[in-house]
Amino acid sequence: MPYAAVNGTELHYRIDGDRHGNAPWIVLSNSLGSDLSMWTPQVAALSKHFRVLRYDTRGHGHSEAPKGPYTIEQLTGDVLGLMDTLKIARANFCGVSMGGLTGVALAARHANRLERVVLSNTAARIGSPEVWVPRAAKARTEGMLALADAVLPRWFTADYIEREPVVLAMIRDVFVHTDKEGYASNCDAIDATDLRPEAPGIKVPALVISGTHDLAATPAQGRELAQAIPGARYVELDASHISNIEKAEAFTKTVLDFLTEQE
């Protein structure tokens, strides 16, 4: 498994597609409590058009989990540092939930490194201290298993959960094996981040995707984000919070159509 030392932290990443070809790059950023495997439904289609860089956000998957709290500046700095290490000058970016929040910050503050950005199931301000403070504390004191039954049912609709037990079991396994300090420290980063004042200054072409049934980053919040970003597109899928898995085909087509259209 490839690793890169970025900002003092070992980050696990994977590249799909022809790494040494001339195709543009896309960086995929995972949601809180998942890892780079969440993008499996998109990789085959995306790698026909792009060099695909997936990575485990610090504190997740096989990346290192240094003691927190973390900040949005660290999360964006990890993306930029990984791009620098791999000599990627500019890239498209797609993130879900926490990954989408990272995308908002990148687009607002580092537009020179981005071509286009897809912000999925996210908002410029996700949740509140009433959500994140007790969740981070519970992760640190009781571990990830104590959170699983409360958090995971919010990721998908009841129909999908009933229909795809094998997928859910795999996702649950990743969640419960996420480093508890890494998870909690990312909760701290989300809690401390409010990008609503910065969203109107984003000049990067943006697509915002929401899930109709998403309770964590609601469609109303998605529309608010899209309306704040000049020229942003908005698409709503019949899904809950992890729409790239629940509605994989529609998500992939929506993203590809946006990224490959001629300006």
Show the residue positions of the predicted features.
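Catalytic histidine neighborhood in serine/cysteine hydrolases
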Residues: G222-I242
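Conserved HGGG/HGGXW glycine-rich cap/lid loop of the alpha/beta-hydrolase fold
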Residues: T9-E64
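Acidic catalytic loop of the alpha/beta-hydrolase fold
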Residues: T212-A217
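Short beta-strand/loop motif that positions the catalytic acidic residue
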Residues: I202, V208-S210
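Conserved acidic catalytic loop of the alpha/beta-hydrolase fold
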Residues: Q74-A91
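Flexible "cap/lid" loop of the alpha/beta hydrolase fold
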Residues: L101-R109, R113-A148
